[in-house]
Design a protein with these regions (language model features):
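Active-site neighborhood of HAD-like aspartate-dependent phosphohydrolases
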Residues: 1-62, 72
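Mg2+-dependent phosphoryl-transfer enzymes with acidic/Ser/Thr/Gly-rich catalytic loops
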Residues: 183-270
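Proline-centered loop/turn at the N-terminus of a beta-strand
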Residues: 5, 59-60, 83, 165, ...
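Active-site phosphate-binding/coordination module
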Residues: 41-124
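Conserved acidic, metal-coordinating active-site core of Asp-based
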Residues: 117-220
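A metal-dependent, Asp-based hydrolase signature
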Residues: 12, 16-32, 79-92, 110-117, ...
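Short glycine-/acidic-enriched loop or helix-start segments at secondary-structure transitions
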Residues: 17-18, 71-74, 95-96, 216-217, ...
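A general structural motif
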Residues: 1-3, 57, 81, 135, ...
Length: 270
């Protein structure tokens, strides 16, 4: 029975593109995701070993804004996962299968109305792609430097009045229902893991993530850490008690894993 539940964001927290990794693709690096026949995401070999070990000592819950399909592309060390969270909390995977009852709780989300309004507002050359994620939320892939001045503020205002929120991570602008959040899904997984006997009721919760969509998850955890890069770094997100890595890129991923082991050791029974 584990004494810690660890929810960990993936992209730019645990796994990295070659550009975001920050060090050469040599023998110390391993590919963990292929896409369209080519390598897409990497981890250092040390990170893969640490994550594998961590998954044997705690209830580790991969927690991502990726869709189920996008998550399934990743060959993440530590699998198979009893629980994983995708679609920013919109799906909980139990032994790899989306839980229908959890997904049904979001059936009232009015995605078409938001898509229609967004299509009218975001119609310039700066929009490269429009995507929906598991019929729960939508996002734009944009040229960041070409986004019109005021678009983010105006769109955020429109969404906020309707129970939605807007955030930008690199080239992606997400429009997300407030009810779809990582922290809500993590709380549900925590309850289920206690119920199924894999987690002690008094267990600590640990979390790591780099984006604005991770903020609620970091705030809800007993202890949380973020890398010194990414959207939260740009926002200077530093609430009391949050640890920030000294390293950036893939080395921050290693530092986060080391930190998890440190927190587990502190809370282990004497």
């Amino acid at each position: 029975v584990s004494t810690a539940l660890i929810s960990v964001d993936l992209d730019r927290t645990m796994i990295y593109s070659s550009a975001a990794l920050g060090f050469p693709l040599d023998a110390s690096v391993t590919c963990v995701e292929m896409y369209d026949g080519g390598p897409l995401s990497y981890m250092s070999v040390r990170s893969t070993e640490l994550l594998q070990k961590l998954a044997s000592e705690a209830v580790v819950v991969p927690t991502t804004t990726r869709t189920v399909e996008q998550f399934d592309r990743i060959d993440l060390p530590g699998a198979p996962w009893r629980y994983a969270i995708t679609t920013n909390g919109g799906n909980i995977l139990v032994d790899g299968v989306p839980d229908a009852s959890w997904r049904a709780s979001f059936d009232d989300v009015d995605l078409p109305a938001v898509q229609q309004e967004l299509a009218a507002r975001a119609d310039g050359d700066w929009v490269l792609k429009r995507r929906t994620a598991d019929d729960l939320f939508c996002y734009l892939v944009v040229e960041p430097d070409a986004v019109p001045v005021g678009f983010m503020d105006d769109w955020s205002q429109w969404c906020a009045a309707r129970g939605w929120n807007v955030s930008q991570q690199g080239r992606k602008i997400y429009s997300m229902p407030d009810v779809v959040s990582k922290s809500r899904a993590v709380a549900e997984v925590h309850a289920r893991a206690v119920d199924d006997g894999s987690l002690r009721p008094e267990s600590i919760t640990l979390a790591a993530g780099d984006g604005a969509l991770d903020a609620d998850m970091l705030l809800a955890a007993d202890h949380a850490i973020r890398p010194a890069h990414g959207e939260l770094e740009a926002l200077n997100f530093r609430p009391p008690g949050l640890t920030v890595t000294t390293a950036t890129g893939g080395r921050a991923g290693e530092e986060i894993l080391d930190w998890f082991f440190g927190r587990i050791a502190e809370h282990r029974e004497p």
